[in-house]
């Protein structure tokens, strides 16, 4: 506390806030409360030395859902802003419940009819077992879509789940749309929604939040209020 107080008194420096971050707020209540108590003790020690902070905060999404006593001056919801729970055990703690609000969509760029035996994408990891219609979707690992989902994941076109065929490329991937009548260039391909994101995270051995954060800057963001884009120049697919 003495060292922090000394730093706060440096000329030209105004210490405005004090914060910590819970290590296991979606797990152990005892550990989280012990961490919170240590934080409060540190704040009190600084106040005894004449250092007061305008804003003190520590409540992450898991704490927001469970521990109102940790709210202090503000809270830091992250994952819950996307409509996701930090842990399965926390579902139902917020009354009506959260619903995923983020989706990633693209459009089919081209559709090709290919004969049985045709290899698809880099490395020829997929060889068509029947005459097929293959759709090209301009989404790849350059957009944050995991290459590890090659030959494993699906996207949704015209309401039907279509498997990824071959390796995910930097800027595109290929879907088998043989069983979806009428697919054509311009059709919307749902890359992620709630169920698809959860499935993709499970296959990739990670959590949905990592995949959401991985969506690269080159992917346009469309923010909607009551179903309407807040930017008239960007419209949702």
Model segments located where?
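C-terminal accessory subdomain/extension
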Residues: 113-237
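Active-site loop/helix belt of alpha/beta enzymes
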Residues: 1-107, 111-115, 181, 232
